[in-house]
Amino acid sequence: MNELTNFANPVAKPETFDQIQIGIASPERIRSWSFGEIKKPETINYRTFKPERDGLFCARIFGPIKDYECLCGKYKRMKYKGIVCEKCGVEVTVSKVRRERMGHIELAAPVAHIWFLKSLPSRIGLLLDMQLKQLERVLYFESYIVIEPGLTPLEKYQLLNEDELLEAQDEYGEDAFSAGIGAEAVRRMLEELDLEGEKEDLLKELAETKSELKPKKIIKRLKVVESFLESGNRPEWMILEVIPVIPPDLRPLVPLDGGRFATSDLNDLYRRVINRNNRLKRLMELRAPDIIVRNEKRMLQESVDALFDNGRRGRTITGANKRPLKSLSDMLKGKQGRFRQNLLGKRVDYSGRSVIVTGPELKLHQCGLPKKMALELFKPFIYARLDAKGLSMTLKQAKKWVEKERKEVWDILDEVIREHPVLLNRAPTLHRLGIQAFEPVLIEGKAIQLHPLVCSAFNADFDGDQMAVHVPLSLEAQLEARVLMMSTNNILSPANGKPIIVPSQDMVLGLYYLSMLKEGEPGEGSLIADMQEVHQALAAKAVTLHTKIISRVPQTDEDGNQYMKRVETTPGRMLLGETLPKSHKVPFETVNRLLTKKEIGDVIDIVYRHTGQKETVLFADAIMALGFRHAFQAGISFGKDDMIIPEAKEKEVEETRLLVKDFEQQYQDGLITQQEKYNKVIDAWSRCGDRVAAEMMKEISAVKKGADGREKPINAIYMMAHSGARGSAAQIKQLAGMRGLMAKPSGEIIETPIISNFKEGLTVLEYFNSTHGARKGLADTALKTANSGYLTRRLVDVSQDCVVVEVDCGTDRALDMKAIVQGGATIASLGERILGRTAAEDIVDSKTNEVLIAEGTLLDEAMVAAVEAIGIQSVKIRSPLVCESKGGVCAACYGRDLARGTPVNIGEAVGVIAAQSIGEPGTQLTMRTFHIGGAAQLNEQSNLESVADGSIEYRELRTITDPRGRRVSLSRSGEVAIIDSEGRERATHRLPYGAHLLLDDGAAVAKGDRIAEWDPFTMPVITETGGIVKYQDLIDNQTLTEQTDEATGISQKVVIEYRATSRKEDLRPRLTLLDDSSGETARYMLAPGAMLSVEDGQEVKAGEVLARVSRESAKTRDITGGLPRVAELFEARKPKENAIIAKVSGRVEFGKDYKAKRKIIIRPDDGSDAVEYLVPKSKVIDVQEGDYVKRGDNLIGGSPDPHDILEVLGIEPLAEYLVSEIQEVYRLQGVKINDKHIETIVRQMLQKVEITDGGDTTLLPGEQVDREEMDEINAKADAEGRTIAQGKPVLLGITKASLQTRSFISAASFQETTRVLTDASVQGKVDTLNGLKENVIVGRLIPAGTGAGMSRLRVTASSRDAALRAAQRNWQESLIAPQTAAEEHAAELRQPVQADTGDDPLGAVVGESHGTDADAGDYLTEE
């Protein structure tokens, strides 16, 4: 019966595996890999080039050098396969085994593995609870360590130097205690560790400890101890006795001409180890003095360190040319390492590259392929076809024919290429549209022809760009290329769902020209019957393209019947109308207007949405041809006279000069500060530039009429800019207006502007000034490319395993979407934001109470229009952020696939798409941080106007009426809402402290009415009661100073910052109000910089202003913009000047000051513990004593720290904050990215939870685990009736999140390879290969896209096999040793029916169907 237990499936291929585990190799394991011990450092004999025996390239150990041939030549050829030659000891087999057979070196003394020693935190150090410094002293033979103190007073693990050791031995006797040195000692210590006991001690200590920092350290140690216990690794394996030697073909030695050799650095490192090891053996045999042996051991340790990780410790070992040698770790690390160079990015065959030229006569799905290239790329196909047709007898002859390029070959090439798509790729491939499939068209010449419309997707131009061609070989690959990657299938951009196949440059110019309408052209007002007559009239020059005419255009009604419709239009627009697809959804009106680039994009969008892909492709090709033809026929060009310098320029410049002189004088007189003068000058000049530019645009765009009443041709430069073909208003401003202000390399603006424009020419000084900015621009561009690429790489890495896994996860969480409104202007409408998302609740029309859109509907354009029409303010939608799917997201939460306009398919790699969509425009973002002066900051809002008609409603607003009868807001979290006539809330606004309210609660407002106004630059301190003011701690020249305004001569009292000299002094400047009986009624703390508005002892009434604090915004501040800001947000870094957020709602009190900080205390209403904050005194505090703050309110201005938002307000507000901040940066550059991409990345940043309470699980408080992992552990605990663990979500930056994915292969290939692998091996991690990256690395089909179904089937099948095998094992175990006949009989009965089918449990599996999900039974539903 026992042979049955060997049921390793004999037919299973080694490639079929489901997971990969990494661990620490034991010495036995290393020996079992090895084919022999390497005893000599020799490599090959330099005369015969034969490997030396027992050396690093030994043929006996590693295998033969030539296929099926032993070293001495006794056995040659296949027939001796498997024989071991008795003379040279070499097995006769293929030489390929030299790539897989390993050797080993038996070390004379153990050495520590540097990864486990030096990779922080040091694993050996944590286990032994020793410092790395002390460990190193022991390992590198500097001091002894007490291993077993015995009965002596020495402590365990105490370090002793030589003298101390001798003293101790004299005192207590040699055998009373045991001490050791070097790796042997550390090894003994690791062997004697009782991990179980250690774990119990640590858990006990953790429960008892009171200190703050102790638990962290204990948890670190606990995790290491636990990982050793769980993984089955033994601690002593971190000390090596045997070193594996990698196969010789992976560290080749190649003879160069001239008798020298090129060798891999590893050979040098191995030789070093072997030499020292052999010397050490000899010294030990000779019984050399201890000190010499010890030195040799230390050197052995160092050489092994260098082999594993050169440069990690001590000096780097260098080769002959002073270059550091590449160790095993360096082979894996970095861009040139194994992971990124060979596993993630490979070079492929069947590819070629060439320069691209434009191919305007191609169709959208075609590309021109040079015949020469095609012949080379499709060679095997041609050989096969020649053979199949019987034209060539042998392969050799076929090759000859192809080389001679006989005419039969060209005919066959045509057949081969027909319907065989090829892939074109342009580097850098920033998003998935950088590789697209086309059908090749054979062309003469040597350049690839590219269709002009796909240029924007590839970001290609024809100034010498090159592109690569790849041939998809297998039928499946061709199918995918045609169905998924064909350029005609990629009309919409995956980033924002807008068409990316949009005419540009010449085409736009031609279409703009075609659709222009001019007054007074010949034949104006004629009636022309139809298109044919229009063509005739144009040919006869009776009308021009721009004449206003009345004509009839054919239209299609809903049933598809044609009818003629009368319209007023121009012949040019009718030509355009001809190209429109025939559909009632796309009427002639869509093109009956002046078409700029943006409008043409909209037209293509409409055509795509209403008539589908095929029509769109035809339409795109048609308008491309039309655009090119008319741009060519119009002959638009411009000369220098088209750059019109406005008359008003000189006047404007003169006025500004006078103004600037005035500011200069004020500064000289000391009325304004240097900074203020600078801001005012910059402001004056930038306004001047803008006014000149406006004048110039007015003149350029003016329509002039000739003597005959015809309009003169419009200005060509204006035409190019306005149509969006080329150039922009800013560029024209530099040509014909004034060049304006320039920046220094530091980013500051130079005060003297460049007044000339390029037409006038710059003076020498101006030219010199402008060189700064020009050079910085070039330097920035270079930096930007690298930074943007790195950002994309981090984004892809964090999101690569986010795939659509199911149709609907059924979550009941949702996001609330509102329109984004800033300063009264709608930046993103509600419709834009909810388009293509799934509604998470029924959308109800509040007037009729009918359900417009049911929950779970994917909102399309028509529904969105309906929602906007009834004026709904906010809609609850599903989002990847709230999705509860395991191992990915669900289709309902994700919504529409933007590149297709349909619901997203299962298996779509939405994570990678999100990363590419955010990373690809990265190069368009700026690099700089903006320095904004006071003047430019004047756009700070200072009043509030109603956005709609309705009534207003104040919320949480305390007001007081001041002596002048105005109502003043006293709360910091007050809001005003505008309610329209149907009772719907149209907008809500925060009202700042001290705002004047112009309307009563519930008052009616019209659109544009003012509701409130306030001073944006100062924040008042307002008294709530009347009384007499008393100064407290306001002492002249200590905390108070008088400043006199020189322009007006009025002096003001200003509070200044005071540093306490002695400990007892604690000056806290404040105003107190006394009532009639001198009782204190209120106190007001004053921040440094507050200007007092009342005198000591003055009587005040309620609502008066006691003091004013100037707000930060009036000063200059740096705004981080562009790429650095996006990176800062995705990395979840703490901002420089971060705001402090109230963690609880409650009343504010000020505690006792602490050195240079003030203490703010918030007492919650529910009587729970107060929360304290320490704030630097220099900061302006936004709250006063006694104020009521809500949770999440700012106590101090600035940008909030995302971690705080998550902790205080939760996931949804955090996501909203991140999305809006990131969108803000892209919006400034005019880049559109759909919100869902950013949400997908934020979801990946929020995967981890920090355990707050471990319950009865293995989780420890304070450790971070995946939310999915915690759920799994909790489900298990719950089933067993133990208490479950609790956790709170934590936000990780993208780099951190990628390094902490559950897959160690993915993390190792990203960054910090050594650290990740060390970690993983200690824990004995298992990589289940769920993400895309891991699968690419192990060389499997990725589990996304078309691979998703395959991976699903594989999982199903393997689970079914496992179940069968388990059943088989059960009855085997009962059969192995039956004690009595009765037992044997029972066992026989238990045996399943299929037992007769032989050993292989899979033999009985009947393929009843194609393995659908249903066959898998519970397996798939369990997940």
Curated annotation (Swiss-Prot):
Q: Which SUPFAM superfamilies does the record match to this protein?
A: beta and beta-prime subunits of DNA dependent RNA-polymerase
Which of this chain's residues are annotated to bind Zn(2+) 1? C70, C72, C85, C88
Q: What class of enzyme is it?
A: transferase
Binding residues for Zn(2+) 2: C809, C883, C890, C893
Keywords of the record, alphabetical order, are: DNA-directed RNA polymerase, Magnesium, Metal-binding, Nucleotidyltransferase, Transcription, Transferase, Zinc
CDD domains recorded: RNAP_beta'_C, RNAP_beta'_N
Cofactor, free-text remark: Binds 1 Mg(2+) ion per subunit.
**UniProt record, GO biological process:** DNA-templated transcription
Reported EC number(s) for this entry are 2.7.7.6
An annotated GO cellular component:
DNA-directed RNA polymerase complex
Q: Give the required cofactors.
A: Mg(2+); Zn(2+)
* Similarity comment: Belongs to the RNA polymerase beta' chain family.
PANTHER family in UniProt: DNA-DIRECTED RNA POLYMERASE, DNA-DIRECTED RNA POLYMERASE SUBUNIT BETA
Q: What is this protein called?
A: DNA-directed RNA polymerase subunit beta'
Source organism per entry reads Rhizorhabdus wittichii (strain DSM 6014 / CCUG 31198 / JCM 15750 / NBRC 105917 / EY 4224 / RW1)
Q: Which lineage ranks, top first, belong to the organism behind this chain?
A: Bacteria, Pseudomonadati, Pseudomonadota, Alphaproteobacteria, Sphingomonadales
